[in-house]
Amino acid sequence: MSMQDTVGDMLTRIRNAQMANKVSVAMPNSKLRKSIADLLVNEGYVASAVVTEENNNKATLTIVLKYFEGKAVIETIQRFSRPGLRQHRGKDAIPTVKQGMGVAIVSTSQGIMTDRAARAAGIGGEVVAFVA
């Protein structure tokens, strides 16, 4: 059976791994997952994201999680737009997360970017998830 919501699965894997105090989490790779993971690395929520090729041409994305004084750096990570209800917003309607202390991940025509970058570029898109 095929997976319907790959981004939701990715966010759930990260959330579950952090609750279990795991060092890293592995998942099947895709371009969208890799770009979201790179954004999380750039924003400082995870330590690194590496794609490895398996022997049967299946790429695996491994995300190394970040902890500070025994607590996970990511306080909340939640899906906003979902396959059954897509949430598209214009540049003026992109929501802020925790009064600017968190990040909204936005899928735009120019790629995956944060809410701040999308507002600065003057473009809207699909609000994929919230991270704080």
Swiss-Prot record:
Entry's Gene Ontology BP terms: translation
| InterPro entries (alphabetical) | Ribosomal_uS8 (IPR000630), Ribosomal_uS8_CS (IPR047863), Ribosomal_uS8_sf (IPR035987)
**A Pfam family the protein falls into:** Ribosomal_S8
Q: Does the keyword RNA-binding apply?
A: yes
Cellular component terms, GO, for this chain's entry? ribonucleoprotein complex; ribosome
Question: Transmembrane region positions?
Answer: none
Q: What keywords sit in the KW lines?
A: Ribonucleoprotein, Ribosomal protein, RNA-binding, rRNA-binding
Gene Ontology MF terms in the entry: rRNA binding; structural constituent of ribosome
Record's function text: One of the primary rRNA binding proteins, it binds directly to 16S rRNA central domain where it helps coordinate assembly of the platform of the 30S subunit.
According to the record's subunit comment, the protein's assembly and interactions are:
Part of the 30S ribosomal subunit. Contacts proteins S5 and S12.
* Family classification: Belongs to the universal ribosomal protein uS8 family.
Official protein name in the record: Small ribosomal subunit protein uS8
